[in-house]
Amino acid sequence: MFSEIIRKLPNTDISISVNDKNLFVIECEGSLYKLATMNPSEFPELPQISIENSIQIEQNNLKDMIRKTIFAVSTEENRPIFTGCLFEITNNKLNLVAVDGFRLAWKSKYLQTKVNDFKAVIPGRTLNEINKILVDSFEPIKIGVAKNQALFELENCKIVTRLLDGEFLNYSSVIPETWETRIRVNKSNLQNCFERISLISSSSMEKEKKYPVKISVDIGKVTISCTNQTGDAKEEMF
């Protein structure tokens, strides 16, 4: 409730206080809100974490890596390990990997300083929230990993999350080393085609159902198509 109130208030100064009745008071121009509070001693303290491994990376780089992998995190709770994203340090390179049984997303970035190899699986929900507060700048964020927890530390902000238990997919074994077919297309045109096709593959009339998108490659032409119960669509790129 508090965040929704603040979000909808006008863009001006806000006064926040606690009155003698232990009510949380929010004042802004003609707006006045009083919210019930709880005993602050009941709120859990930030846990003390014995960091075993840590890295530092620019916020804009981490934001880009999360954006390019988080969509492939599974939402199926029967496979909890895949509801997170693998953070893996190998040979001074950070790998972020997500998989949901249909898709695998992998993004890597070499680090500027020498660090030890380690791996941890961070919950996807945590990464979604962290991504909201990361900024597009070279300001650093420090990531520390303990036995069963991780710490994300920015300027004036610390986020602690549990790690997911289990054996993550050996992703390198499922990425082909050779390809039967390789094509080069205009990225912007391909993105526009997929956005239009998605109107058919994700029909608003059938919110719970997704239809497969078919990609056919011929000499000098790529065809993207999809059919659902109400219609079909085809896009061609030359």
Where in this protein do the model-derived segments appear?
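Structural preference for solvent-exposed beta-strand-turn elements
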Residues: 1-238
